[in-house]
């Protein structure tokens, strides 16, 4: 719909045109002016009534759109302390089975199995791969009790009369507990029947700094490292060298060194090898212009040859026509001469 402006009159209702009175034609030319013409009068715009209807827009409230967040339910696993106790029981039972299967030949090795078992129980709580959540206080208490038990076992073992074998002791190669050895001591190798796997795991996990501070357990920890019979013989003959060997083993027991990535190899052309291929020469703008000019000349020559061929063909046509005309003239002249005679 296109709205048009309609002039407003007071006497007539809106949107109704006033009737136009046509006068008879006169001799004078009518002059249109804004006074005597409706078209040139002052036009007033039509007023459009405002909309009376009301629209109620119902927008959803923000409270309905808010989704309440759900808190995740934390489930406390009650099976973890049971697993720790199961690991301890397994260590104790395996130590007892190893003692039953392989009886130790020396009394000293049999007596040292008790502090070793206590040390295995001590390190089993540290060697547990799954940390105990919520039982930190109980774990610390059990560790303290186990360390106290291990120290009591070690003190009782050395107080009963068992000594430490030494190659430089004055009386029978045995020193009483509490006296220092002038040179580093070397204990006999463990019997193959006795298993020392919990102590090895403790050494791997704890290292040297985290071992207990009691002298008996320290010496047991040193004895737990695997040794060959040849190495034992050399250590008995030369104790300072054995100490150096132990320090070398301790250095090697640290974290493995990370190898740095090797840089990529750069291939170079030697004298014996062939040189790299020569690069193509880059054409200068002058050479490009010369090449374009030569191409244009070739095109012009080709065009000129075509034109010349056309011209020659035309010339040959004209010559042929001339020859034909001459022949006709001769024949006409011969006919006229024969008729005159």
From Swiss-Prot:
It comes from Homo sapiens. The lineage of its organism: Eukaryota, Metazoa, Chordata, Craniata, Vertebrata. Disulfide bonds: none annotated. Residues 79-101 have a biased composition (Basic and acidic residues). InterPro entries: POM121-like_prot_1 (IPR043220). Residues 243-252 have a biased composition (Basic residues). Transmembrane segments: none annotated. PANTHER family: POM121-LIKE (PTHR15566), UPF0607 PROTEIN ENSP00000332738-RELATED (PTHR15566:SF7). It comes from the Eukaryota. Residues 72-131, 216-283 are annotated as: Disordered. Residues 108-127 have a biased composition (Polar residues). This is Putative UPF0607 protein FLJ37424. Belongs to the UPF0607 family.
């Amino acid at each position: 719909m296109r709205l048009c402006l309609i002039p407003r009159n007071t006497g007539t209702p809106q949107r109704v045109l006033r009737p136009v009175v046509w006068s008879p034609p006169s001799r004078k030319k009518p002059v249109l002016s804004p006074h005597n013409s409706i078209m040139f009068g002052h036009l007033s715009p039509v007023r459009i009534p405002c909309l009376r209807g009301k629209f109620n827009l119902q927008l959803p409230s923000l409270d309905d759109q808010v989704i309440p967040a759900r808190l995740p339910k934390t489930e406390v696993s009650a099976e973890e302390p049971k697993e720790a106790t199961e690991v301890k029981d397994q260590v104790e039972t395996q130590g007892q089975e190893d003692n039953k299967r392989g009886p130790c030949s020396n009394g000293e090795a049999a007596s040292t199995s008790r502090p070793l078992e206590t040390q295995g129980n001590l390190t089993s709580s540290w060697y547990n791969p799954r940390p105990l959540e919520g039982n930190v206080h109980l774990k610390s208490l059990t560790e303290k009790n186990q360390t106290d038990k291990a120290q009591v076992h070690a003190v009782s073992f050395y107080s009963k009369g068992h000594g430490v074998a030494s190659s430089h002791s004055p009386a029978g190669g045995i020193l009483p507990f509490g006296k220092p050895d002038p040179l580093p001591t070397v204990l006999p190798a463990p019997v193959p029947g006795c298993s020392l796997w919990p102590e090895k795991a403790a050494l791997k996990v704890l290292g040297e700094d985290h071992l207990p501070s009691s002298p008996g357990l320290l010496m047991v920890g040193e004895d737990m490292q695997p040794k060959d019979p040849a190495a034992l013989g050399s250590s008995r003959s030369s104790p300072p060298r054995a100490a150096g060997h132990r320090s070398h083993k301790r250095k090697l027991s640290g974290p493995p060194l990370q190898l740095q990535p090797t840089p990529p190899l750069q291939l170079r052309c030697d004298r014996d090898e062939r040189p790299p291929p020569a690069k193509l020469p880059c054409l200068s703008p002058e050479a490009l212009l010369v090449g374009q000019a030569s191409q244009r000349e070739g095109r012009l020559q080709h065009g000129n040859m075509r034109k010349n061929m056309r011209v020659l063909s035309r010339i040959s046509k004209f010559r042929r026509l001339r020859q034909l005309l001459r022949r006709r003239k001769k024949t006409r002249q011969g006919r006229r001469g024969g008729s005159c005679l």
